[in-house]
Curated annotation (Swiss-Prot):
One term under GO cellular component: cytosolic large ribosomal subunit
GO MF term set: large ribosomal subunit rRNA binding; structural constituent of ribosome
Protein name in UniProt: Large ribosomal subunit protein uL14
GO biological process: translation
One Pfam family from the record: Ribosomal_L14
InterPro entries: Ribosomal_uL14, Ribosomal_uL14_bac-type, Ribosomal_uL14_CS, Ribosomal_uL14_sf
SMART domains named in the record: Ribosomal_L14
Described function: Binds to 23S rRNA. Forms part of two intersubunit bridges in the 70S ribosome.
Length: 120
């Protein structure tokens, strides 16, 4: 379960390696998020185009908790991962590492699905 103060892995080539969740967008009383939700993060480690302590938006692409599909199956991952976004919700990086779920295209993140190495 991803909530405030959770540390997440960044899976794009923006330069950040690890981020910390400082806010959850989409409501005042939301306590946790799932795949496809947008969070407010701060960069904890990494180098490149984004610097340490930068505050950015990110979309959740993998969770340990997993995602339940309409056919009843679950997809779970080994880590909690995000892709960093600009203010206009376009992705910062040009590559996505590792698998992502195809349900991201239903949530208007089809660019992430098209750039991913593996779509489940």
């Amino acid at each position: 379960m991803i909530q405030r103060e959770s540390r997440l892995v960044v899976v794009d080539n923006s330069g950040a390696k690890e981020v910390l969740v400082i806010g959850i967008l989409g409501g005042t009383r939301r306590s946790h998020v799932n795949i496809g939700d947008i969070v407010l993060v701060t960069v904890k480690s990494g180098s490149g185009t984004v610097k340490k302590h930068d505050v950015l938006k990110a979309v959740i692409v993998r969770t340990k908790k997993g995602l339940r599909r309409k056919n009843g199956s679950y997809i779970k991952f080994d880590d909690n991962a995000v892709v960093l976004l600009k203010e206009d919700l376009n992705i910062i990086g040009t590559r996505i590492f590792g698998p992502v779920v195809r349900e991201l295209s239903d949530k208007k993140f089809s660019k992430i699905v098209s750039l991913a190495q593996l779509v489940l």
